[in-house]
């Protein structure tokens, strides 16, 4: 379950709201981004995010150490911290 958000884009998409942040996000990715956020919200264990394989669940390194991600596409990711069966600091970021 998503406990906290790290940016307005992720919060706006999961709530299906039209905000400044969601309007700036590529329109062709809004549905996929929301779907990935809902997968994250429904997950009770980190391993739940391994399916579908297109999620490409990863543990991040470097400045993102302590975070995991699932992919929306090659450029955009849902990034989050996982603890106690919940997701924290959930963000959608341009990873490149």
Annotated model-derived regions:
Residues 1-37:
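Arg/Lys-rich, positively charged N-terminal/basic patches that mediate binding to nucleic acids
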Residues 3, 30-33, 49-53, 65, ...:
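Generic structural signal for well-ordered secondary structure
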Residues 8-9, 20, 44, 52-55, ...:
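Residue-level signal for pocket-adjacent positions within structured domains
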Residues 40:
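Conserved phosphate-interacting/catalytic interface
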Residues 44-68:
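A short, surface-exposed loop/turn module that caps and links secondary-structure elements
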Residues 60-61, 67-96:
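Enriched for short, Lys/Arg-rich terminal
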